Amino acid sequence: MSESQNSLGGGALWNDLQHLIMDAQVALADLPRWEKPFHIFWLLGPFFLLIERSPADLWLSILALAFAVRSLCHRDGAWLSHGWVRAAFIFWFVCLLSASFSITPAYALGEAMSWFRFPLFAMAAAFWLGRDKRLLYAMLLSSGFGMMLMTGILTAEMLIEGQKGGRLTWPYGDLVPGNYLAKAGLPAFCVMVALAVSARGKTIFLMGTLASFSLALSVLTGERINLIIRLCAGFMAGISWRFTWRKFVLVCVISIVVVLSVFALQGSVEGRFTTAILHDLPTGASSDYYRVMGGGVMAFFDAPLLGIGTANYRELCANILAEGSAFRCDNHPHNFYIQMLAETGILGFAAGLFMISAMIMSLFRAGRANKQNVVAATAYIVPLGLFFPLQSTADFFGQWNNIFLWSAVALSMAAVNLRAEQGSS
């Protein structure tokens, strides 16, 4: 296999793309007949995520269930020996335990049971669907195409309808398109930025242009945390693979210019990303995030060991907060770790932290062992960015956010299969 086939960014861009597609076709042809449709279905995932939550959830759930059935039929339990897999099962067990002892056990157990489809999907990607690096690269390419298709959709919305209250809503009809770019598209975005910093030839210009264009659309969506995730992830990707100061500084300057240019051309969004961020910092009662997160802390104090029950916060918050409290209820506390404390207690918090840390460390070690491969070197950034504690977040046990988030985490976890090869890049 040629050098350009071994990884991304090692040669002429068009030749690399041709090799990736041909390698994927060969890999699919080598699969057992019954497995081939599932792998093709997996590769189409980024486009299901562009439709709506129900088709996307069906895609993810079918593949997670198929992996579980396949493992039972083949009596394949080798994947259970991996540290991050065991950590996920430990966290799930604590969630089930918390739900069982809550005052609404039927509801909480149902939520805890259904949530596990997300880490199970990550296991399916790592130990089945993305085990062949040729299909892993194909999925990364599919994710990149999906990300650029989303930027095209959002560009069309800007030209046809414009922003609505400083936000964009296409193609879903609600305020979440930035989730696709920042979460589902994060593995591809990290590779794009790394290639823009350290690849050769025309690849640098094309990857830099595509990354900058999608970054501009992130600003226009008006989703602040998602923009920060992409900026920070891009910064880390730039220093994680074949780092060179001169190109890295150039990419950083271009990113800053892109963001400032959007502010200048679309002045209505500037305040949302500057003064509004400072006002919303959860440092006092004047911040709504402080009052919402504080409600989660109060729920933790109400049941510190096992919490109030998985996904129970929205149901029980009003009974926990006293009338006239400085805090207020919402569907969730808007921070993953506060939500873990509130709903699964200190045991769930410790188990959840262990699970997330195990995933990040598995990918970081794999990247260090294969530093010349851009996908392996940047994969750890995805769970680190998406689970970073100092940010406001969506519902940890919810549906739509988890579909975006775990589709990216699943793709990144498959990078543990990449092994360093002599002469690869």
Residue positions per predicted region:
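Membrane-embedded alpha-helical segments of multi-pass membrane proteins
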Residues: 54-71, 112-124, 180-189, 227-235, ...
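Alpha-helical transmembrane segments of multi-pass inner-membrane proteins
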Residues: 46, 120, 134-166, 173-242, ...
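Transmembrane signal-anchor hairpin modules in multi-pass inner-membrane enzymes, especially those
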Residues: 1-110, 127, 131-137, 141, ...
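Long extracytoplasmic/lumenal interhelical loops at the membrane interface
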Residues: 280-294, 302, 306-344
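Transmembrane alpha-helices of multi-pass inner-membrane enzymes
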Residues: 62-68, 190-191, 234-235, 379-391, ...
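A membrane-periplasm/extracellular boundary helix in multi-pass inner-membrane enzymes
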Residues: 221, 238-285, 294-302, 310
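Membrane-interface catalytic loops of GT-C/OST-like multi-pass glycosylation enzymes that act
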Residues: 106-110, 178, 221-229, 330-335, ...
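Hydrophobic transmembrane alpha-helices and their immediate junctions
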Residues: 344-386
